Amino acid sequence: MSTLSSIASIGIGATIGASCRYYIGIISVQYLGKGLPYGTLISNIIGSFIAGVLIVLVLEKLFLSETYRLMLLVGLAGSLTTMSALSIESVEMLSGGHYSQALINIVLNLALSLLAASLGVLSTKYLFNLA
């Protein structure tokens, strides 16, 4: 696979992932309010689950070509999940004196993202009889 093809594959996936993250943020504010940055939390959970599924498919060499691996794992899951947004939102909460809210935000993002990635791995192994 050429460098240009790799960049294009990642770019396509990243465009989709970032767009999804943007709209998840908008929709989460409409339905869940602004108590916590739910859009970042939801995006991180979904992206971590997708990454968990994809990593099994890549490691077990099932049906992902290099093009799709780059597009889905690096591009889509990488741009859907967002450590930078989690960091900035948490720093803003801390700066505003909302210490417990910041702690809840950090713990929820880390714990639920790890849980989602684990569920992605386990469910994919189960579905493909790899467990």
Which residue ranges define each predicted feature?
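Membrane-interface helix-loop junctions in multi-pass transporters/channels
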Residues: M1-A131
